[in-house]
């Protein structure tokens, strides 16, 4: 995929989009019964591990606070239309390609800025999931005048991008990973120590272990790491490690070994499964576990938050069951249920996505596909990353990448600045704050078209958050 320089290249973008849209304020309401149901579900699912059951089909609607929200984002006039790059990954099974639709959150930020007369030009490029491709993407964006770059992919191949960015003094924000964080590279992922603590607390909680134990130790809780070798999991004292593969023959051997380990009752406790791997591998492994009747709690990797994972899981009879959890940060649609400032800011994002989805003339970042095809998956990290660069470029005195990099390092942004789901503090290389913990689904993801074809659109679930307050960071 090449660039689409026409996106945002017309400084009158906001005028065209505003003319297509009505001027009335969008009001989002959630009925009392929905809020009550989600609260009950949150309490129930958040405190116990149960025999997994398929969750009820979602309605396809997005919950939001019952408040008036401001969709437009206005920044101080600079007299320039800044150029910001977004790197994503296209290609079947290419490393990081699972996050391509999530990256459309950056398109939402661009749209909101245009509504507020603060247009930005977005250059969008495919890194092909290779280290060389990532390097070439950054080099191309730099040559085209990008003042900052959002890395909306995930995986070791991003080292090519971060190396090239550092050579050119161009700031980058990794929306979904933490490769080479530091020295002009900011990350919205959990930092390694924070991730380790949250995993440990989550495992102990799922196992029903006492909260008075050490938050750094599993204290005898049985854990089995299902390692596909394609992802990463924190370095914890797992009871067992099992190499897994999506290959059918290998999966049979994996299930046989796992059944043997699960049958060992000597410790008197049921094990917690930790799954790592690509989106496609995790989906296929979970589907195989379900077919084999294995119902142990599973902590899946963050790839479970992507469309390819959900689509592959649902194919051929798989289900998003209530024993599946993900360690992560609060999600936009769940945050929108809150009545505080963060909830209102997240509601603005959710309502803008819905507004854009209903405008058939709007395209995604590529300029080729209708935004409606990816609307359901557009997320907070990519939105917040583009927004942060917009703020930085609005405050520089010199319109250079070096100046943007310096200013970005001084920024602290929160809901009042329209960040979604969590605040940002760029004095740290790990800039995302807010609450982290165990994400659990409250509604089953479903095929919008009702089929099982790989071309069908998929509706995501709403992932709620069970927090561990000691691990939250503001």
Regions found by a protein language model. Name each.
Residues 171, 178-202, 243, 316-332:
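Short beta-strand elements at the ligand-binding edges of bilobed clamshell
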Residues 66-105, 113, 131, 374-376:
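Extracytoplasmic "Venus flytrap"
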Residues 39-64:
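C-terminal region of N-terminal signal peptides and the immediate post-cleavage residues
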Residues 289-383, 394, 466-471:
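Extracellular/periplasmic periplasmic-binding protein-like sensory domains
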Residues 1-26:
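Terminal targeting segments of Actinobacterial cell-envelope proteins
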Residues 97-101, 116-181, 188-190:
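Beta-alpha junction/loop-to-helix N-cap segments that form part of ligand/metal-binding clefts
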Residues 362-386, 390-452, 470-473:
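Segments of small-molecule ligand-sensing domains
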Residues 185-296:
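Extracellular/periplasmic Venus flytrap/periplasmic-binding protein
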């Amino acid at each position: 995929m090449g660039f689409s320089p026409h996106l945002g290249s017309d400084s009158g973008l906001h005028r065209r989009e505003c003319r297509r849209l009505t001027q009335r304020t969008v009001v989002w309401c959630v009925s009392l019964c929905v809020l009550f149901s989600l609260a009950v579900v949150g309490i129930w699912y958040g405190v116990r591990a149960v025999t997994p059951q398929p969750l009820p089909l979602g309605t396809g609607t997005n919950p939001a606070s019952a408040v008036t929200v401001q969709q437009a984002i206005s920044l101080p006039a600079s007299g320039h239309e800044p150029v910001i790059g977004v790197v994503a990954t296209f290609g079947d099974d290419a490393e990081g390609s699972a996050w391509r639709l999530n990256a459309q959150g950056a398109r939402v930020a661009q749209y909101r800025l245009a509504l507020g007369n603060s247009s930005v030009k977005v250059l969008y490029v495919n890194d092909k999931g290779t280290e060389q491709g990532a390097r070439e993407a950054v080099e191309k964006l730099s040559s085209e005048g990008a003042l900052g770059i959002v890395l909306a992919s995930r995986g070791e191949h991003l080292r090519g991008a971060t190396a090239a960015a550092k050579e050119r003094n161009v700031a980058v924000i990794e929306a979904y990973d933490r490769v080479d964080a530091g020295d002009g590279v900011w990350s919205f992922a959990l930092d390694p120590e924070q991730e380790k603590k949250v995993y440990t607390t989550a495992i102990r909680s799922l196992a029903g272990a006492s909260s008075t134990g050490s938050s750094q130790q599993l204290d005898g809780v049985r854990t089995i790491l299902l390692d596909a070798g394609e992802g990463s999991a924190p370095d914890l004292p797992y009871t067992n490690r099992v190499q897994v593969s999506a290959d059918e023959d290998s999966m049979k051997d994996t299930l046989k070994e796992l059944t043997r380990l699960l049958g060992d009752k000597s410790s008197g406790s049921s094990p917690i499964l930790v799954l790592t791997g690509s989106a496609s591998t995790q989906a296929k492994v979970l589907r195989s576990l379900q077919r084999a009747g294995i119902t142990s709690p599973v902590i899946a990797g963050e790839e479970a938050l992507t469309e390819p994972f959900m689509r592959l899981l649902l194919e051929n009879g798989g289900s998003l069951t209530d024993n599946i959890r993900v360690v992560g940060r609060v999600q936009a649609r769940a945050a929108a249920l809150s009545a505080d400032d963060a909830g209102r800011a997240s509601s603005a994002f959710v309502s803008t996505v819905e507004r854009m989805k209903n405008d058939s003339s709007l395209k995604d970042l590529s300029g080729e596909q209708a935004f409606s095809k990816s609307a359901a998956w557009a997320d907070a990290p990519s939105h917040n990353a583009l927004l942060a660069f917009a703020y930085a470029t609005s405050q520089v005195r010199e319109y250079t990448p070096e100046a943007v990099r310096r200013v970005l390092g001084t920024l602290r942004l929160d809901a009042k600045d329209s960040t979604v789901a969590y605040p940002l503090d760029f004095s740290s290389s790990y800039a995302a704050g807010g609450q982290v913990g165990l994400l659990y689904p409250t509604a089953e993801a479903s095929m919008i078209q009702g089929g099982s074809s790989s071309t069908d659109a998929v509706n995501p679930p709403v992932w709620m958050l069970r927090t561990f307050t000691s691990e939250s960071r503001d």
